[in-house]
Swiss-Prot record:
Pathway: Amino-acid biosynthesis; L-methionine biosynthesis via salvage pathway; L-methionine from S-methyl-5-thio-alpha-D-ribose 1-phosphate: step 1/6. The active site is at D277 (proton donor). The gene is MRI1. It comes from Lodderomyces elongisporus (strain ATCC 11503 / CBS 2605 / JCM 1781 / NBRC 1676 / NRRL YB-4239) (Yeast). This is Methylthioribose-1-phosphate isomerase. The record marks C176 as: Transition state stabilizer.
């Protein structure tokens, strides 16, 4: 794919013509293809298959799909769906990805709109307009909040480095994809990296330190880091080096050794910044599988060696679930075993991109455990960054107050 054809716009909603198209993230980074979403069922399939992913984006696509579904029903000669029919469809949509709370929150909000009507009542323009206004506001708020998250994360990074009296270049590790492709735009964890690089890269930083390099984890087994985060970093021209998930400890150890380097880079890792699909009342955070081990690695280096690495979780307030007390109560989605036993991608011949094929990489017929998420205990999290102006940090007793 030529660089001119690339885009970071994951969601296209035409407010005038009421159409929804999403960027098919299963074919990135080799192809830019948009898929038309014309119904709630289309959205369910796209979310379930991970053609769209990222907790905020899932909620936005779900909400817009509901709008499109109602609109098409009202315009159809045979359109006579009831409130009860819509409520049944909403519960079906909710089952597409159970771990991320944003979709559940959006569906609950829409359910509240429907509570004013009888279940037997036929869908009408008033219901449509209320849900249309809700969905567009959800998108607009998410985009504005992502920029706030970026600025708040930048502020926290600057304050942390100043408190430590750190000077010189530093690096950041991230996992999965938490950028424009996972949200309405800019991103959460990757949004912080964007904002930080814009203000703190070597040529513009007015501080005694600067962001030198980013290390995105490959993010097995679905490889969102390799496919999507590298796509965004390359698009934004932010310097990065891709690593496997199991290289993190070695990377940190190498970069803290003044006599060693990684392809000429020596800037130490000072921050690990991740997103979240659900943050519960006590601060436990569910995120892409592999996040928990990053926090554990950071804790080891912080406690066993003379290293200070801040572990930051970045997410909008819509990701915070105050109705769930601890991470033990979070339902963790388990993905199909084939995602672990096969690799899917196009055949590459030089610069030519061929047909997509599936390649086996494991012994046939074996048992596989493939949880999509893990839960990082709040005790391992240094800060939770949201659109709220002040970063959430633990009190003297090691507890978060997210209310």
């Amino acid at each position: 794919m030529s660089k001119e054809s690339r885009t970071l716009q994951a969601i296209k909603f035409d407010r005038q013509n009421v159409t929804l198209d999403i960027l098919d993230q299963l074919v990135l980074p080799y192809s830019t293809t948009y898929i038309s979403i014309k119904s709630i069922d289309d959205a369910y399939n796209a979310i379930k298959s991970m053609q769209v992913r990222g907790a905020p984006a899932i909620a936005i696509v779900g909400a817009f799909a509901i709008v499109v579904d109602i609109y098409n029903n009202l315009k159809s000669k045979d359109g006579n769906s009831s409130i009860g029919d819509l409520q049944t469809s909403l519960q079906h949509l909710l089952r597409s990805r159970p771990t991320a709370v944003n979709l559940a929150n959006a569906i609950n909000d829409i359910e509240q709109i429907l509570c004013s009507y009888e279940t037997s009542e036929v869908l009408n323009e008033s219901i449509y307009k209320q849900i249309f206004d809700y969905a567009t506001r959800l998108y607009d708020d998410d985009l504005a909040n992502n920029h706030k998250i970026g600025e708040n994360g930048l502020k926290y990074i600057v304050e942390s480095l100043k408190q430590e009296n750190f000077k010189g270049p530093f690096s950041i590790i991230t996992i999965c994809n938490t950028g424009s492709l996972a949200t309405s735009g800019h991103g959460t964890a990757l949004g912080i990296i964007r904002s930080t690089y814009a203000k703190l890269h070597k040529e513009v930083s007015g501080e005694d330190f600067f962001l030198d390099h980013v290390y995105p984890c490959e993010t097995r087994p679905y490889n969102q880091g390799a496919k999507l985060t590298t796509y965004e970093l390359d698009y934004e021209k932010i310097p990065f080096t891709l690593i496997c998930d199991n290289m993190v400890s070695s990377l940190i150890q190498t970069l803290k050794n003044e006599k060693k380097d990684v392809h000429g880079k020596t800037s130490p890792v000072k921050f690990i910044i991740v997103g979240a699909d659900r943050i519960v009342r006590n601060g436990d955070a569910a995120n892409k599988i592999g996040t928990f081990q990053l926090a554990t690695i950071a804790q080891y280096f912080n406690s066993a060696q003379d290293t200070k690495i801040k572990f930051i979780v970045a997410a909008p307030r819509t990701t915070i679930d105050l109705n769930t007390e601890t991470g033990d109560e979070i339902k963790i989605e388990e993905r199909p075993h084939k995602e672990l036993t096969t690799l899917v991608g196009p055949v590459l011949n030089g610069l030519e991109v061929g047909d997509k094929i599936t390649v086996g990489i494991a012994t046939p017929g074996i048992t596989v455990w493939n949880p999509a998420f893990d839960v990082t205990p709040h005790g391992l999290i240094d800060s939770i960054i949201t659109e709220d102006p002040i970063a959430y940090v633990k009190d003297k007793n090691g507890n978060y107050n997210l209310t």
